Amino acid sequence: MRKGLPLLLTLLMTSTAPGLRAESFGHADVDGLTRTVSEIRGQLRDPASRKDDVRALLSGRLAEVRQDGAETPLALDRLATAGKLHTVPIDFMLAQLRLQTARHFNVEIEKALANRAAPALFIRGGSMTLDQLLAEAANSHPGALEQKGEKVVSHWPIVIWSDSALVIAPGQSLELSTEDGAFILNSGLLTVDGGELSASDGTNPGLNAFRPFVATAMTGAVQARRAHFKSLGFGGSGATSGLSVLGAALFPSKIASYLTDSSFENMSGISLENTHRVVVSDNHFSGGTGPAIALKGVTGAQIRDNVITGTTEAQAIDVQNTSSSIDVTGNILIGNRGSGIFVANDARDIAITDNLLSGNGRGGVSVVRSACVTITDNIVLSNSQVGIKLRASHALTLSRNDLVANAGAGVSIVDQDENARVVVDGNVFTGNKSGIHGGAASEVALTANDFSGQSPILLDGEFAPYVPHLLRAAAGSNADSRALTIHANTSSADPVDCKTGS
């Protein structure tokens, strides 16, 4: 039975139970969807493109991806007072970086500083625009900044103190010198409103791997809209990742960080850690090592309507380390080296909804050692490895997803605890290596799934003996008889309660 199914039995796998998507996939449908996704990918090659540029192609099976999320907060916070420019010794700057980023501090950063005798620029007492910063630096600190065409190049590190702000306005461009080891430490407010923030070309002689970065820490916040970030960051996630927001329990930021309608080109990535109320929406991430967006210990973030393509080393979206109440909605994640979305290490209350995940190197979605994750209304198409992989996780619901032509199983469920439970409801399986793979799994409840396009292997691994049960359930006369529970829990332990958090 595992090797193949007669056509009649396969047709039995089309369920008409409520909640199922209205139409099954045929070969022509798969070919059409594949062509459309290829066209979407082609139109998104320009880093300046956005999801809106392909909205006309998001129809039919892709209509759920088309939907807009909640309104983006567009109001930028402003400081009423004018800031002043000072300098601080570089050792103070490094001590602050070490203090404010704690374990995220990279001790090798000191090697990147071309002139250890030079101080760092220090903004405090209010707000400064980039033009004001350039003018004051030219008067009192020659050589710290210079105008090169339309760009302002910083050769010194810049500190934005907790009572201050730096504003990069529309049409303005700040370039941090790679050769000089420049970077920004922000514990105040960094605003990039229609401007550009980038790293210069070249190699740092003291630390070849170094690329300039922006670290926002403790009470700091960063707000960007219609901005362009380019070539920032090195060393994966953390303070040097490119653009980071690193919160602290004793020093919570009173201003929310958000990044919207912006381009991130060849960035190592965005790293959000131990912070809350963050919105990352309507952006385009192209190239870079990845993760494009990494969350660790984050509460209450919205990651929505972003385009992420071509990460070279890691996943597109990475949610880890007790992150909770995270909404990942309406994103287009295509051609990334790792998984499209990776959730791990005690993440909880994660909603993954209305996303398009295609051509990703380590599968569409992976959930590892996490709980209370819902994966709903996603298109998971032609990914290497598995469409959706669940490992050692609790209280998971997969509903109304299209799992199509993935190199591995449409869904893989492995290494579950004895009291874990997975609900697989109303999904469509088409042309995957197998429908659902099981290994050391606990309870899996199957209802109203469509396997009519999934052949020859419906259930794989330790689930293979359940194929006859699945066929009988599919032929049932009512919704209750069409349900199938594999490995029903017999443990006396209470299941995870997603409402109470226990």
Q: Which functions belong to the PLM regions below?
A:
Residues 22-329, 333-342, 348, 357, ...:
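Beta-strand/loop edge motif enriched in small/polar residues
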Residues 2-8:
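Sec-dependent signal peptide recognition
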Residues 20-28, 443, 458:
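Conserved, well-structured beta-alpha core segment at the onset of a catalytic domain
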